[in-house]
Structures are given as structure tokens and as C-alpha cells.
Curated annotation (Swiss-Prot):
GO terms for molecular function: haptoglobin binding; heme binding; hemoglobin alpha binding; metal ion binding; organic acid binding; oxygen binding; oxygen carrier activity; peroxidase activity. This is Hemoglobin subunit epsilon. GO terms for biological process: hydrogen peroxide catabolic process. The modification Phosphoserine is found at residues 14, 51. Red blood cells. The epsilon chain is a beta-type chain of early mammalian embryonic hemoglobin.
Length: 147
């Protein structure tokens, strides 16, 4: 289990309170699909993913990205209990969707980049470290049900 200090929690929640979940979620998932094109195979039903502009403009990518980032909101509310928070999502991604758990790490890293681009000077090394710790812990929690 990962332990977050009061300072780390404050760094994460402070930035999260300023986050536009809809915009950043679509951007994060879109960039994941562009930078790591093999991840597109999990989104066959999303329609046109033929180019970066098609991906970033795709309404299904934006909607699912919002859903993904909303689940990160659950992580922030439950930073001390991530394994339980993500148990059902872990099971879904493992047993039904068969998503390679490495993809959770990739998405987390993309999210950190999105935060850095959106928040500039507010995204200090301490804030980056707290967010990196959170996205890594979420990736571990999502991979928990894998055998």
C-alpha cells in the first residue's frame, strides 16, 4: 500500500480542483492513442482513429477520456484505499477487456505531461512527484486483479 503525506495530498488536490476534467480527459486519452498507437485496438468501436487530428477530435475519445479522468477523481478522494477503489475497474480491464496493465502506466505518464502543460509554473517538482506517485499507485491498483 502506498502512503501519501499530507503535503502530497495537498499538492494533488490543489491542482485537481483547478482541472477541467472534460478537456484534460479527452486530451490525455487522445494523446495516449496517438503516442502509443497499439492502444487503439481497445477502442475499435470509437470510429475514426486514422490520424492524430481524427483521434483528438473524436467525440467518443473525448467522452471516454472524461470518464477516465473522472475515475481519477475517485482516486484523489480515496488516496489511502486505491486497491479497493479500483477493484471493479481492475476486474473489468483484466477479465473482460484484456487490457495490458502496462497501458495504465502509459496513461498515467501521459496525464502527468498534460498536467505539466496545463499548469506550467504551478507544476513544481514537488507537485510532479506527488502526481507521479499517484498515477503509479493507480496503475498498480488497476493491475491488481491480473494473474
Amino acid at each position: 500500500m502506498v502512503h501519501f503525506t499530507a503535503e502530497e495530498k495537498a499538492a494533488v488536490t490543489s491542482l485537481w480542483s483547478k482541472m477541467n476534467v472534460e478537456e484534460a480527459g479527452g486530451e490525455a486519452l487522445g494523446r495516449l492513442l496517438v503516442v502509443y498507437p497499439w492502444t487503439q485496438r481497445f477502442f475499435d468501436s470509437f470510429g475514426n482513429l486514422s490520424s492524430p487530428s481524427a483521434i483528438l477530435g473524436n467525440p467518443k475519445v473525448k467522452a471516454h477520456g472524461k470518464k477516465v479522468l473522472t475515475s481519477f477523481g475517485d482516486a484523489i478522494k480515496n488516496m489511502d484505499n486505491l486497491k479497493t477503489t479500483f477493484a471493479k475497474l481492475s476486474e473489468l480491464h483484466c477479465d473482460k477487456l484484456h487490457v495490458d496493465p502496462e497501458n495504465f502506466k502509459l496513461l498515467g505518464n501521459v496525464m502527468v505531461i498534460i498536467l505539466a502543460t496545463h499548469f506550467g509554473k504551478e507544476f513544481t517538482p514537488e507537485v510532479q512527484a506527488a502526481w507521479q506517485k499517484l498515477v503509479s499507485a493507480v496503475a498498480i491498483a488497476l493491475a491488481h486483479k491480473y494473474h
